[in-house]
Structure formats: C-alpha cells, structure tokens
C-alpha cells in the first residue's frame, strides 16, 4: 500500500478515485511526568513524552487509513494530510487526524 502526501504517484497512473479515507488516534500524555514540558519548550528543550505520543498517534492513524483503503481494494492513498490537536482541559491528550483519497493505480 502506497501512502503519499502528494496527489499523484510518479510513474503510475490513477485509474479510479475510490473514496476518502480518514482515521483518528487519541493518545494520553502523562501530565505529571511531563508537566515541565512547557518549561522545556520555553528554555529550548524537547518533550520526549509528547514526541512519543505524537509519533504513536500518527503511526496508528496511518495504519488505520491503510486498513480502510485495503477494504476498498485500493492500491494507494494520495493527498494524505495530518492534523494535530491538543484539546484544552482534556487532561493531556493528543489527537491526530489523518485523511486522504483511496485510489486504484495502473
């Protein structure tokens, strides 16, 4: 399964646009362990806890759009876009939303 942020696959022709596929992944962030993330960011550090949560959420969302595209018998998902949200007041959650178009290729 080819996953691409571009709207075409070099060397391949899109023969059918099947459907929009999307997925979301919500990851909890350990607020107590990472309550100093804001200070680290302020002083130029990096929050490994938050980076891990974001990476895991992105991987899960990508895997889910692959599964949904396979169910449509797609060869690829093009135009993939990721949106990241950290809802305020939700106790340290990271939400990644992925969307793209499932296509058939020649």
Curated annotation (Swiss-Prot):
Q: Which domain of life is it from?
A: Bacteria
Q: Per its UniProt record, what InterPro entries does this chain match?
A: UPF0145_dom_sf, UPF0145_YbjQ-like
**What Pfam families would the database entry show?**
YbjQ_1
What SUPFAM superfamilies does the database record attribute to this sequence? YbjQ-like (SSF117782)
Assigned protein family: Belongs to the UPF0145 family.
Instruction: Read off the PANTHER family from this record.
Output: UPF0145 PROTEIN YBJQ
Task: From the Swiss-Prot or TrEMBL record, give the protein name.
Answer: UPF0145 protein Pfl01_1745
């Amino acid at each position: 399964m080819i996953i691409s942020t571009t709207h075409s696959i070099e060397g391949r022709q899109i023969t059918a646009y099947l459907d929009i596929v999307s997925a979301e992944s919500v990851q909890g962030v350990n607020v107590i362990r990472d309550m100093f993330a804001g200070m680290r960011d302020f002083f130029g550090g990096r929050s490994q806890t938050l980076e891990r949560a974001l990476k895991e959420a992105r991987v899960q969302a990508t895997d889910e759009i692959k599964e949904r595209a396979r169910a449509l018998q797609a060869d690829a998902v093009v135009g993939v876009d990721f949106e990241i949200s950290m809802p305020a007041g939700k106790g340290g959650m990271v939400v990644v939303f992925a969307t793209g178009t499932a296509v058939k290729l020649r």
